[in-house]
């Protein structure tokens, strides 16, 4: 027997008998043999003891590789399973996942594991790690595993998904589990780890399945990396809009009433209203006609648009109204704006026709994907569509992009890049079938960006089903890539809906439709702002811009109300805290609620017609006249908006 192993640099090593991954690594270099934690064999991750006896391509994995971290974290998950099963014999284990985010294990137990129990489980894992117990890789008959897990519905479910008679499994003493690509050869290799949190998760992500408990953790080869990761996670937790939304009473979601359906509390509604008014004013100033259109539409419109064929899985089921009428909750606003266009006969003099709306939409998101305001089932999109002549496309594109950049400047959004999103040429079935249209529109989009001299990346497979688009990708406060804005060229929908305009030649022509979103949905945008600002919104956005605290309600309450009225009539959002609480407590509460200005009013202030001002985040108190404070807060508001 003779075979060759091809290395990443193209070189080959010849062997005349079966060898393990570790032996291949050692044959390359003794140091590599010691550093190896696994390998990619023909693209698949394999453990160190995996045997090779034929021609293969191989890339050795060490602790320097991302796959090495995955192997480490999978081993940590396996070790957690072993100690958890020993501590709670009645515990049933579900699926386990290890990736760039760490690892998690789904568990089922009558009395759920409390987060306060995690340190005890960590100690058990540390003891197991110090013992350096061997982890044995075995290939077992599927039937043997089925018998072993016959009373475990979760493992039985997972085994049903395996179509091979042989299954890779791992043993640690009497404990056995399967579903791992590769694990380290003993527990002593796990090094630095942390159990992080617990959460609920439906089995296999389906809301019709039982709710299990998901235990999250992470692991690293180096202690410094673990410490840095934990620091990053603390920052993420501090910025999480769901936590801030709860603490500042901005919004809530009650799964019992409806998962993915947020309720906006007064403060959250105020922030949203300020953003919406800002957006509408900017768009109207830019020539857009703002409209309102119904959230329900005849299903035939979505069959014509192609949404029903290409987007059905993300739409709610249609409502049968009888007599053949089928109504659909709209997942997108474009067919509605097309009806606005079609309502009148259009001439070239009407173009560009810019239609905009804060349009409410509904999309069927799986319950497991829902998250705060970022992933919801009901959303309001800052949507707009421009109908143009062909020779107006590039100038309109530039105009829309300028509007987006102006908005970004006002909200201080600086961390972004441009992505041209094309269809996937290898999977054209999910797109509108017109090669000429795709080539033409992709070329026009690219040309518009090149004419503006802007850098961009190109991404195949990220286009909408009806046309290519420019996506503006922002970096969230939590470090995630997110599409904030889009500009999209569409030759398809005007054709499908028979849109026309009368040209200068008196003949009918087909307009081009430009879809655009400036800040996406209100829900996602406000989640983004909440995390960027950590809930400390700039004064122009803050739900309460000034909090007035009278030292004594009886003595100073009337003056406090006078100051409130004076500020309110100038358009500032101001409240009086006249609760029967200690003044120090009320001041701390104002700071906790991240109110930009706290005004304390006592005898001195009432006598002089002044206010004692404390800015959020400082301990400094400054006494000034009410007029001076009004000038200060007015300048502050204008410094964050286009008014200055």
UniProtKB/Swiss-Prot annotation:
One cellular-component annotation, GO: cytoplasm
Known CDD domains for this protein? TGS_ThrRS, ThrRS_anticodon, ThrRS_core
- What UniProt keywords apply to this chain's record, in alphabetical order? Aminoacyl-tRNA synthetase, ATP-binding, Cytoplasm, Ligase, Metal-binding, Nucleotide-binding, Protein biosynthesis, RNA-binding, tRNA-binding, Zinc
Q: Which Pfam families does the record match to this protein?
A: HGTP_anticodon, TGS, tRNA-synt_2b, tRNA_SAD
Q: Which InterPro entries match?
A: aa-tRNA-synt_IIb (IPR002314), aa-tRNA-synth_II (IPR006195), aa-tRNA-synth_II/BPL/LPL (IPR045864), Anticodon-bd (IPR004154), Anticodon-bd_dom_sf (IPR036621), Beta-grasp_dom_sf (IPR012675), TGS (IPR004095), TGS-like (IPR012676)
Which top EC class is named for this enzyme in its record? ligase
Q: Which residues form the TGS domain?
A: 1-62
Quote the record's binding site residues for Zn(2+): 334, 385, 515
- Give compartment(s): Cytoplasm
Q: Which cofactor does it need?
A: Zn(2+)
Spell out the molecular function terms from Gene Ontology. ATP binding; catalytic activity, acting on a protein; metal ion binding; threonine-tRNA ligase activity; transferase activity; tRNA binding
PANTHER family of this UniProt entry?
THREONINE--TRNA LIGASE 1 (PTHR11451:SF56), THREONINE-TRNA LIGASE (PTHR11451)
Oligomeric and partner information? Homodimer.
Q: Which family does it belong to?
A: Belongs to the class-II aminoacyl-tRNA synthetase family.
Q: What job does the chain carry out? A: Catalyzes the attachment of threonine to tRNA(Thr) in a two-step reaction: L-threonine is first activated by ATP to form Thr-AMP and then transferred to the acceptor end of tRNA(Thr). Also edits incorrectly charged L-seryl-tRNA(Thr).
What is the designated name of this protein? Threonine--tRNA ligase
Which organism was this protein described from? Lactobacillus acidophilus (strain ATCC 700396 / NCK56 / N2 / NCFM)
Q: Which lineage do the record's taxonomy fields give for this organism?
A: Bacteria, Bacillati, Bacillota, Bacilli, Lactobacillales
